[in-house]
From Swiss-Prot:
Compartments (UniProt record): Membrane
Keywords, comma-separated and alphabetical: Carbohydrate metabolism, Glycerol metabolism, Glycosyltransferase, Lipid biosynthesis, Lipid metabolism, Magnesium, Membrane, Transferase, Transmembrane, Transmembrane helix
Record keyword Magnesium present: yes
Native organism: Trichormus variabilis (strain ATCC 29413 / PCC 7937) (Anabaena variabilis)
Name this protein carries in UniProt: Beta-monoglucosyldiacylglycerol synthase
């Protein structure tokens, strides 16, 4: 990854510490998030107003482009700028990581927040307690977030079997959700590196040996491994998620190769303790702790690396309703961080390359779907093609190219067969059709956040142990 574009004397130590952003954060309930703006610290207040302002600007701007004579020229110019950035992403050469650790291996603390996970928690605990890593150099903490099923009993029995397994039971009064659980256990851990997995994770035995060497570069604050869908063959939705995860990790690696932003994805994330402390831990005022931490790490001038191999397996949701709930949470949390940290972003605190990459991503992922509705309405009223057609075409093309490239990169270690290109093409076409749901999710989320006084309700993803 290229060096950060900020000069050396602009070190993050000379800026306001990021942990001060969270110092006044109050805690919230987990399963139903009902907190209103008045109970939030200043940085996280007024999210609805900010979202409404952005929505107004996007809608009025899109309508104006249909009414002015130079609207088409503006869109072609924007498409050109996005296209140049896209070409850079496509042709970037991924970073080659150091595979061996120089010196002694650091201590690693593995954290899992679990609530009512009786179907999967035993397998995960045994999996994590038998990783290929020197004995005494890692520990496993499972935080039982006041489960009402057999999870506490299962964990109690497993703790007798494995010395490295430690269990923290949270009370019914504990708040903060997953972020609160992770923050509560963090002072009890010893690791220089903190790993976080979901309860349905399936972890490769040599995972730590692949990830830990990446932290030898001092600016690396976190590493995200590729997420793979364990039950990918089940139906259309899980097959689509498999292709989606391939697209996501490909984009992450290509963006970081350009000096852009790597992002955390929750399951399979590894964070340097020093970086986590400097950012103030996990934010308990967000519904997507991983996406929020991504921004704070970059604002604090840390880098995030993304690793294709090995992958962490997880269950994909199997129904359209479950997918809708999950993706709405991801969309709201992802959009929310732009509203929370917009002033620091505009101050270029991340550095020019990262700020530019982030803005290109925001335009494609959030602004374009939001603008699609007024663009379509104006096209119908004025009996003309949608103004945003060129930008939309570029976005879809990048999705197709990235998905095919990601799927092919995953298959690189497999023996080539004559039918492989056709299989990849079929998976890409199916994945592209599946990805259209994001257009509806994003456009509805940005609109809903502008009008609803509450933040999104969190609906627990049920894990059944499928795909094992």
């Amino acid at each position: 990854m290229p060096a950060n574009s900020w000069p050396d004397n602009d070190s993050y130590k000379e800026l306001d510490p990021l942990n001060s952003l969270l110092s006044e954060v109050s805690t919230t309930e987990e399963s139903v998030v009902e907190t209103r703006d008045l109970s939030l610290p200043s940085r996280f207040q007024g999210r609805r107003g900010k979202a409404a302002l952005v929505l107004t600007i996007v809608w009025s701007g899109t309508i104006a482009l249909h009414l002015v004579s130079w609207g088409s020229i503006f869109i072609l110019g924007l498409t050109t700028v996005l296209g140049i950035h896209a070409l850079g992403v496509v042709f970037a050469r991924p970073r080659h990581y150091q595979k061996e650790m120089q010196g002694s291996l650091p201590f690693v603390s593995i954290l899992v927040a679990a609530k009512n996970e009786e179907a999967v928690i035993a397998k995960l605990a045994r999996n994590l307690c038998n990783l290929e890593y020197p004995n005494g150099q890692y520990e496993v903490w499972i935080i039982d977030d006041n489960s009402s099923d057999k999870t506490p009993h299962i964990l109690a029995e497993l703790a007798k079997e494995y010395d490295k397994l430690k269990v923290l039971r949270r009370s019914a009064q504990a708040t903060g959700g997953k972020s609160g659980a992770l923050n509560q256990v963090l002072p009890l851990t010893q690791g220089e590196i903190i790993a976080v997995f979901d309860a349905d994770a399936q972890v490769a035995s040599d995972m730590l040996l692949h990830v830990v060497p990446l932290f030898q570069r001092e600016k690396v604050g976190a590493v995200q491994v590729r997420k793979a869908i364990a039950n990918a063959k089940e139906n259309f939705w899980t097959k689509g998620q498999m292709a989606e995860m391939s697209l996501d990790i490909w984009f992450q690696q290509q963006r970081t190769a350009l000096g852009g932003i790597g992002e955390l994805r929750g399951n399979g994330q590894f964070v340097r303790r020093q970086a986590l402390d400097s950012c103030g831990g996990w934010n308990e005022e967000t519904i997507t702790d991983d996406l929020d931490l991504t921004f704070r790490l970059h604002l604090d001038k840390w880098d995030i690396e993304c690793l294709f191999y090995p992958a962490v397996q997880e269950e994909g949701v199997t129904t359209a309703i479950a997918l809708w709930h999950q993706r709405n949470r991801w969309a709201e949390g992802g959009y929310q961080r732009y509203l929370d940290y917009w002033d620091l972003i505009l101050k270029n605190r991340m550095g020019t390359r990262k700020t530019w990459d982030m803005l290109m991503f925001m335009l494609t992922m959030y602004i374009l779907p939001t603008a699609a509705i007024p663009d379509l309405l104006m096209a119908v009223v004025r009996h003309r093609p949608p103004m945003l057609g060129p930008v939309t075409g570029l976005s879809v093309t990048m999705s197709v190219v990235g998905m095919f490239a990601g799927l092919r990169r995953i298959r690189q270690e497999q023996k080539f067969q004559v039918h492989t290109p056709f299989v990849l093409l079929l998976q890409t076409m199916r994945g592209t059709l599946y990805m259209l749901h994001w257009l509806v999710v994003m456009s509805s989320t940005t609109a809903r956040m502008s009008f609803r006084p509450k933040r999104l309700k969190w609906v627990k993803t049920v894990h059944t142990g499928s795909g094992e």
